[in-house]
Design a protein with these regions (language model features):
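Preference for intrinsically disordered or flexible, low-complexity segments
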Residues: 1-283
């Protein structure tokens, strides 16, 4: 996809009167029956955050302006028989009890812009892209608790009921001083090998992405860690381990202080807005 390169990064700044999104809380613009479900056990996922996508990072068109992120963290939970096949493959419901009735209602009313993803350890995530009109409506009501399987138990208790907390609102603050803005992140850029031994480096020698703690950054005093530990769109990545392969420059990076997702206790995650892939690692 031929996209215009962003010229700014955008960092999250919490504010009581923030207008660019919120962590925790409930989503807006979806019905209780549209609340994303785990493909492992059918339980409604936790809402992690909703964020406005800056125009420079909006790869989906002008009608879609917000991204709501949900997590189930169900990688160690017991599988509810038939749920994955029902939701992912269109198979038949296995029962007519309250749990399956709620699951049928969800499948028949799924939000048209819901995207389901599985992370590297098998945990489920959902992204819902929302319009300004949808987000400007009232916050969503929780699904009925009839939607829980009989004898439901979770290893991590990350679902819409256990994680129903007051919202924390925020603004997005633009910055144009990140040298990596608009550049695809790479862990080992080829161009750096040819110049890293040069003592008299100049800013004009920069030919591509520079990892956050690379010695070239120190030689040129680029201050790439200026926004370290900030949730942000684009620019210099701050992964807990290495930069994910094939991560585009159109990404959002966050850690567990944004809505309390389960990403290893000290993890950092990246959502690639071009591919809808989520990556995360912990230290």
């Amino acid at each position: 996809m031929d996209m215009k390169k962003p010229k700014n990064i955008y960092i999250v700044k919490y504010a009581e009167t923030g207008t660019d999104g919120w962590a925790y809380g409930r989503p807006a613009g979806i019905k209780p029956s549209q609340w994303p479900r785990s493909r492992v056990n059918g339980v409604p996922m936790a809402h992690i955050f909703t964020v406005k996508i800056p125009a420079e990072y909006n790869v989906r068109g002008s009608d879609v302006e917000y991204l709501s992120v949900f997590q189930s963290s169900d990688f160690e939970d017991d599988e509810e028989e038939g749920v994955n096949e029902f939701l992912q493959e269109g198979s038949e419901a296995l029962d007519n009890n309250a749990f399956w009735q709620e699951l049928v209602l969800y499948r028949n009313n799924m939000h048209p812009r819901e995207v389901y993803q599985v992370d590297e350890i098998g945990g489920g995530w959902c992204f819902i892209y929302l319009t300004e009109e949808e987000v400007s409506g009232k916050l969503s009501e929780l699904p009925s608790k009839n939607c829980l399987p009989v004898d439901y138990e979770s290893m991590h208790e990350i679902n819409c009921f256990s994680c129903d907390q007051p919202a924390r609102y925020f603004n997005l603050e633009p910055h144009s001083d990140d040298p990596n803005v608009g550049i695809k992140p790479e862990e080992y850029p080829d161009w750096l090998e040819a110049i890293e031994a040069i003592d008299s480096l100049k800013v004009e020698d920069i030919q591509g992405y520079i990892p956050i703690f690379h010695e070239v950054s120190e030689k040129l005093d680029l201050n790439l860690d200026k926004y370290f530990n900030n949730h942000h769109f684009g620019g210099t990545a701050h992964p807990a381990q290495s930069i994910p392969d094939e991560l585009s420059e159109f990404y959002f990076e966050f850690d567990e202080t944004l809505g309390d997702p389960n990403i290893g206790g000290d993890g950092v995650a990246q959502i690639d807005l071009l591919t809808n892939k989520i990556h995360w690692a912990c230290g």
